[in-house]
A protein has these predicted regions:
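C-terminal lobe/lid and adjacent interdomain/linker elements of RecA-like ASCE P-loop ATPase modules
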Residues: 243-306
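Electropositive, glycine-dotted interaction segments
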Residues: 16-159, 163
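Conserved ABC ATPase signature
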Residues: 154, 167-170, 174-220, 227, ...
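Short, hydrophobic/aromatic-rich segments at coil-to-beta transitions
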Residues: 4-13
C-alpha cells in the first residue's frame, strides 16, 4: 500500500569486500531560486555523498575518501585528512581524484569496477549487431551488444581455450562447430550444423542458437573479470540447451552472479556445481528482498548520511 513520501528522492548504490567498501548517494539538485538564470535540469541527478573505506563495514576511522556535495577529502600516507578538493556535482571522485600517489585506493577501486561485466539482454532480431559482419580486431572481451561476436570467438580459438569452445558448441549442438572467416577485411561467422549441406551465416541462425553462441563468447573470455553478471541467460533458448548452458556457466573463471527465472537451469547448475549458492528473491512492499532473510540475517551495512 502506497504511503506519503517522507524522505528525499535518491538512489543509493554500494558494495563491500574484505579489502574495500564503496557507496554513493544520488539525489536531485536544489531547485534554482534565481528567476534570471532558470534551468531545465532540475531532474538531472547529482552526487550527494560518496565514500570509500577500508574493510567491509563503513566506520569513521576506516574512511579513506569522503565526499559531501562538491567537497572531497582524502587521507594521506600518515592517515590524516589531507585538505579538501572540489569537483563537479555530476562527477565522481573515482574519475576525478583517482591518483596513484595522492589516493591509490581510489584508483584500485575504480579499475576494479571497470573490470566488472554485466550482460543484460543481447539483441537477436534481424538487425542485431551480432548478425552483422564486422572489421576484425583481437577481442578478448565481448562487447555488451554482442556486435563483435565473430571476433570474440576467433580470439578464443587463437588465444584462449579452443577446446572448451568446441566442447561448449558440441554439448549444445552435437557434431556441430563454429568457424570464423575473413571476407574483404571483415570477420564472418559460419555455423556448421550436422545434417545441413552448407554452413549457416549469423544472419540465418535462430534466436536461440545465436544467443547461446553469445554466452559462449562471454563466458570463455581469455580475459575473465573479477565479477560477471548474467541477467536471464535462458531467454530465447530451447529447454534442451539449458543443461549445456549450465555446464558452460559452471566452468566460468570468475565470480558469477546469474539472475534466472528458469528453474531447470537453476537445478542443472546446482547439480553440476553444488557449491554454488542459490538465493531466491521476492517482492516485499514493492522492494526486492532475499526470501526468508530477516533483519538479523542481513550483512552489516551502513549507508553514509547526507
Amino acid at each position: 500500500q502506497g504511503t506519503v513520501r517522507t524522505k528525499a528522492v535518491g538512489l543509493r548504490l554500494g558494495f563491500s569486500g574484505d579489502e574495500f567498501g564503496y557507496a554513493l548517494d544520488f539525489g536531485l539538485p536544489v531547485p534554482s531560486s534565481d528567476p534570471l538564470r532558470p534551468t531545465l535540469f532540475n531532474l538531472d541527478p547529482e552526487f550527494k555523498r560518496e565514500c570509500l573505506w577500508r574493510g567491509p563495514v563503513l566506520r569513521p576511522a576506516a574512511l579513506l575518501a569522503d565526499r559531501a556535495g562538491p567537497a572531497v577529502r582524502v587521507r594521506d600516507d600518515s592517515g590524516a585528512w589531507a585538505g579538501s578538493s572540489r569537483i563537479g556535482l555530476t562527477d565522481s571522485m573515482l574519475s576525478e581524484l583517482a591518483d596513484p600517489r595522492a589516493c591509490p585506493e581510489l584508483l584500485v577501486v575504480r579499475e576494479r569496477l571497470r573490470s566488472w561485466r554485466f550482460y543484460d539482454q543481447f539483441r537477436t532480431d534481424a538487425d542485431a549487431p551480432a548478425r552483422q559482419d564486422r572489421i576484425g580486431t583481437r577481442t578478448p572481451v565481448l562487447d555488451h551488444d554482442g556486435g563483435d561476436l565473430a571476433a570474440a570467438l576467433r580470439t578464443i580459438q587463437e588465444f584462449g581455450d579452443d577446446e572448451a569452445l568446441a566442447e561448449a558448441v558440441s554439448d549444445a549442438f552435437p557434431r556441430s562447430r563454429v568457424e570464423v572467416e575473413a571476407v574483404d577485411g571483415l570477420l564472418r561467422l559460419r555455423f556448421h550444423q550436422h545434417g545441413l549441406l552448407r554452413p549457416l551465416a549469423a544472419a540465418e541462425l535462430s534466436d536461440g542458437t545465436l544467443r547461446y553462441l553469445l554466452w559462449v563468447a562471454a563466458l570463455l573470455s581469455p580475459r575473465p573479470p573479477e565479477l560477471l553478471v548474467l541477467n536471464e541467460p535462458e531467454t530465447s533458448l530451447h529447454p534442451d540447451l539449458l543443461p549445456a548452458l549450465a555446464a558452460l556457466i559452471a566452468k566460468a573463471r570468475a565470480q558469477l552472479i546469474v539472475v534466472s527465472h528458469a528453474r531447470p537451469l537453476v537445478h542443472a547448475l546446482s547439480a553440476i556445481a553444488p557449491e554454488a549458492a542459490v538465493l531466491e528473491l521476492e517482492k516485499e512492499f514493492g522492494a526486492t528482498v532475499l526470501a526468508g532473510q530477516g533483519r538479523l540475517g542481513r550483512p552489516a551495512w551502513h549507508w553514509p548520511k547526507r
